[in-house]
Amino acid sequence: MLPYPQIDPVALAIGPLKIHWYGLMYLIGIGGAWLLASRRLNRFDPTWSKEKLSDMVFWMSMGVIVGGRLGYVLFYDLSAYLANPTLIFEVWKGGMSFHGGFIGVMLAAWWFGKRNNKTFFELMDFVAPMVPIGLGAGRIGNFINAELWGKPTDLPWAMVFPPFSDPAQLPRHPSQLYQFALEGVALFLILWLFSRKPRPTMAVSGMFALFYGIFRFIVEFVRVPDAQLGYLAWNWLTMGQVLCVPMILGGLGLIWLAYHRAPAKSAAQ
């Protein structure tokens, strides 16, 4: 069994102001995505300035934050937030939905593209390889918060999470680290290498949706579902898996369309 590193969720406290690691992970993810996007900016559109890139990253980041929070409220715990709406704003306590954030990013991409003469999939293909940076950083934030841990296990890398998080004090799968490895590291490598060469429009977006959906679906088997939802069916199906099914099918559909439709301008990522 591996020891769980005791890390204070508050990274810095200045008087009443508290800066949480969870929030810092979002900033690190957004900053890392911007740096990587700036490296490929000339390949995407030589006429774009760093300022325009920053504008795009800003609006997509707003889509992640607002969509992620609203997605969690709608998909995972609607009744609790209806009973106490002020809880919606307590984002430092966790409670973000990837699928909600993904919808938020798509809406931001559509809106920004309409105003900058870019199609929806041109922007999505460009940003997709950068998204795993934010996903990986977010999973580290989950780990520091000692949330979203896995089922009990006797594997040698099991961890006992703090009593405030897991009163049962059982050795568990560190499922946040599994997701960091798959959604952050593995997905980044797949998309970064795949997009090094020009690909048909929609291909990179399809790869992102497909592999994220697969990775998340797999990890959900060892991750404990949200207590207020539990399993939706068969004592194993979770809300996360249900939301991943359309991503997997949509990803396959996008890849098929990208390579079988009439020839179109290739997207150089």
From Swiss-Prot:
Top-rank taxon, per record: Bacteria
Record-listed a 1,2-diacyl-sn-glycero-3-phospho-(1'-sn-glycerol) binding positions: R139
Presence of keyword Transit peptide: no
Catalytic activity, EC: 2.5.1.145
Localization of this protein: Cell inner membrane
Pfam families: LGT (PF01790)
Sample GO molecular function, one term: phosphatidylglycerol-prolipoprotein diacylglyceryl transferase activity
Involved pathway(s): Protein modification; lipoprotein biosynthesis (diacylglyceryl transfer)
HAMAP family: Lgt (MF_01147)
Protein family according to the UniProt entry: Belongs to the Lgt family.
Annotated protein name in UniProt: Phosphatidylglycerol--prolipoprotein diacylglyceryl transferase
Species in which this protein is naturally found: Pseudomonas fluorescens (strain ATCC BAA-477 / NRRL B-23932 / Pf-5)
Encoding gene, per UniProt annotation: lgt
